[in-house]
Amino acid sequence: MTYAVDTNVIFDILFADPEFGPSSRDFISQFCNTNDSLVACDIVWAEASAACNDKAAFARLMNDFGIAYSPMPDSAAIRAGAIWRLARSTSHNAKVRQRLAIVPDFLIGAHALECADALVTRDRGFMRRWFADLKVVDPSKAKRP
C-alpha cells in the first residue's frame, strides 16, 4: 500500500511534539522493511522543507523517514479545485466564501485520494468531511492498518 503523509505528522516527529510525536514516530517507523511506501505531495514537501535550515538536511530527514516526493498530477489539482469551490459555496463564513486562494489541505487530500491508498494525518475531521472516499489513518489513534 501507498500512504500519503500529511505535514502535521512530519511536524510531530520533527519538533518532538510531546503529545503526538511518539505515536507519529512509531507509526512511520513501522514502514521500514515493508513493501508499503510513504509519499508526500508538493504542498507537504514545501511546508516541511520550510522547517529545515538547508536542502541537504531536509533531504536526509525525508530519507530517514522513508518518505518519497510525489508530485501532484493535474487530475488531483483539478479535483482539489472542484472540492474547494464546493466548500466556498456552502460555507456560512463570508471570509471563506470570498477567498479565492485554495486552502492547502484541499490539495493534500486530493493528492492522497488520487496517488495513495490512504492519508496519514491527525486532521481526520476535515479530510473525512471533504474527501469521503479517502481512507484516513490517524497515527495517534491507531496502529498501522
Task: Please provide the spans of the model-predicted regions.
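A short acidic, often aromatic-flanked loop/helix-cap motif at beta-alpha or helix-coil junctions
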Residues: 46, 75-79, 141-145
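Active-site neighborhoods of divalent-metal-dependent phosphate/nucleic-acid chemistry enzymes
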Residues: 68-118, 124
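Short, well-structured N-terminal submotif of metal-dependent ribonuclease cores
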Residues: 1-40, 49-63, 144-145
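Conserved beta-strand segments of alpha/beta enzyme cores
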Residues: 37, 66-68, 135
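Acidic, PIN/NYN-like endoribonuclease modules and their adjacent C-terminal/linker elements
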Residues: 2, 109-145
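A generic structural signal for short hydrophobic patches within well-formed alpha-helices
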Residues: 10, 45, 77, 126-127
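Short, hinge-like loop/turn segments at secondary-structure boundaries
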Residues: 55-59, 87-89, 137-140
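Short beta->alpha linker loops
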Residues: 43, 53, 72-75
